[in-house]
Amino acid sequence: TAQKQGYASLFAQIKKETPLGGDVAQEVLSKLFQRVVGEKVAELGFDMVNGDNRSLEALRGLMEKYNDDFIPNMNIEWEDISIESIMAAVGEEARWKFNIPSVMRKIDGISGGHLIEVGARPNVGKTSFHASLIAGPNGFAHQGANCIILCNEEAGKRVGERYLNAASGMSRYEIGVNFQKASSAYYPVSKNIRIKECQGRDMAWVESVAKSYKPDILVLDMGDKFSAGGNYARPDEALKACAIYARQIAKTYDCAVFYMSQLSAEAEGRTTLNQSMMEGSRTGKAAEADLMLLIGKAPHVEGEEQESPLRHINVVKNKLNGWHGMVNCDLDYLTARYGV
């Protein structure tokens, strides 16, 4: 008969199919069962709307009977916490070494996945700080790191000049006088440095850059000016969202992200700084950082022709090795180099 032929065709087709794995079959059956229970819940709700059922007892009975079927069974791949694995990870924590001796004595270095927040008042030397770390002697670029600098405050060429100063150890005037010397010092590190002026961009664009160019070091100057998108009730919530996004980029694309920030007016002329001085933020930004460095300088002394070159780097958060305190160094503003 036609019905018999139909069954024969169906069974022949089933015979050809590849059987589902045990886990997949279990999941499919579980989903179907949950749908059946959902239909029963909907029927009870419909009866209550129509006044046919005024008690929750039937619904409570369903929940007690089938609750375990809606709690998924997990298959988690737990972290390897053997001593060999832990010590190997510790060895990778400082892949890129700091080139400021006073900092290096306290913090070995950084690695992919780290979010480093750097804060300072205007005219303290934020841009020179990352230029010195990357392009200065024994900096990240010298160590072979692929470095990308995204700047949305200063013009890209001006930021590039700081990198030229730091790499060559020469002022603008000295470079003009001895261009060949500057070029020979700058060329080896410039191959590992890319700078992009990017006003008006958001964190989604930053993530696209990280995905496309795979940097080892990614500098956001200024981090707070890259919008994270969305609507926020308070400015500090928006800044927290930016920091969270930056941290996700660091972890997802295995790069060290330097997140440059302004400090509030409270930090003006101060040498000892703390997390609460981050402009516009409460604790949201600080909570995301692996390392937070706040750069202070003493107020200008009346009658002095030039401000002091001394800079005070406050290590106010440090998940890398736990050391907190202040290290001192000098900034040569002509060569954009931090040193001792």
What are these regions (language model features)?
Residues 1-81:
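Short, small/acidic-rich helices and loops at N termini and domain boundaries
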Residues 105, 141-214, 228, 327-329:
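Cytosolic-facing regulatory segments adjacent to core modules
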Residues 194-252:
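Phosphate-binding/switch loop-helix module in NTP-utilizing enzymes
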Residues 113, 215, 289-290:
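Short, well-ordered alpha-helix to beta-strand connector turns
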Residues 71-169:
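The Walker A/P-loop phosphate-binding site
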Residues 97-100, 157, 183, 203, ...:
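Amphipathic alpha-helical transducer elements in NTP-driven molecular machines
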Residues 116-118, 148-150, 196, 258, ...:
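Hydrophobic/aromatic beta-strand patches that form the interior of the parallel beta-sheet core
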Residues 244-340:
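Phosphate-binding/switch region of NTP-binding enzymes
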